[in-house]
Amino acid sequence: MPELAFPETGEVKTITTDCECSTDFVERSEKDILIAELNNKPSATLADYEESEPGPVVSKRKEKVVDLERKYEKLEERLFSFKNIASNDSLVAFYTRFPNYQTVMALYDFLNPGEHGENINYWLSGKNVDSTPKSMKQERPMTLKPVDEFFLTLCRLRQGFAEVHLAHLFNISQPTVSRIFISWVNFMYLKLGHIDIWPSRELTNATMPEDFKAKYATIRVIIDCTEVRCEMPSSLLLNSELFSSYKHHTTLKALVGISPKAFFTFIGQLYTDGISDREILERSGFLNLPFSNGDSVMADKGFTIEDILLLGVSLNIPPFLGMSDQMSAEDVIATQEIASLRIHVERATNKVKKFRIFDGVIPFSLFGIVNQMWSVVQYTGPHNQCLNCIIFEFNDGII
């Protein structure tokens, strides 16, 4: 019990009080308490506040909140995000190489990363975040929305932006950019890799251009090797394996195949440039493709592979000079015809290099996902027939 002292008399008395503690205060919301403090009414409730006229302090604070919300909306509009460029087709094409917002979203919906990116195995410092329980994974803090992570990935592939530049654009850290890019490239590679891009003989015939029908109607695929430049290693041994005398630079080399209609139908992995055309064809899995009897393959002179092609599959390459001093008129015509048709595969690979990440020098930091990137840019290019079908389906026949 509390005691009260009286100095004048020297008495000390014990004071008893009967009071009942109310829980009303505990049950009030934080908003009730704040309003009560602002109006100097300790017992005020939200209902009391709503019935009364707001005080000048409350009015000022309300005005400040409204002003801050307006400023926030304006700042959000100035952020670099896919939402803020979606209505501008030229910007969408510049950053993603897709013609419009609908096309990008058709691919995004096909990939289906999940509302919060829960379908993606996020990479982090060499460890896969998928080892984390799914409940924890779904609650991870998202720096960017999944659609903006997708946009960031397309920006880097299309324009070849450096990580530090993307970090500045999206207002995130450079390691976060790296984590997002690696995760999304692997995710896209796995999803798109399930698409069968090898067309049937019937589809090849149905889409055969007139240029081929006269003399090369049996062509199933046109193959060629292409190179992309990579960072020069400090190791002399590795440097010698990567160096290309043709490009005068260290390069990686891949086998690609297109249909007569100029769609990619085979995407090989990247190898060191020291590998021969014959060896890269044997190691790439090209010989395991389901050819039909009577098919033919068109290639350059370097592909002396007729002896290793499947039974019933022939090879169309420019004729060799042999022991003669000059070619016959027939051989010259055949060389010119094949060269004029093979130009389509060179044009297709040049379109891939319009994704500027492959137009420049591939850094060592991306060697771990270079094959995934190589496949993704070919699957997502406008020259890919299967991607066009995906876009057509998800756009309800718009394209």
PLM regions with names:
Residues 2-3, 159-399:
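Short, well-ordered secondary-structure "scaffold" segments embedded in the functional core
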Residues 1, 64, 100-103, 148, ...:
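Alpha-helical interaction elements in eukaryotic regulators
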Residues 78-79, 137-139, 148-151, 235, ...:
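Short, flexible segments with low predicted structural confidence
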Residues 145-160:
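Short, amphipathic alpha-helical "recognition" segments used to contact nucleic acids or chromatin
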Residues 2-144:
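Charged, often Cys/His-bearing segments associated with DNA-binding zinc-finger transcription factors
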Residues 24-27, 57-60, 66-67, 74, ...:
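General helical secondary-structure elements
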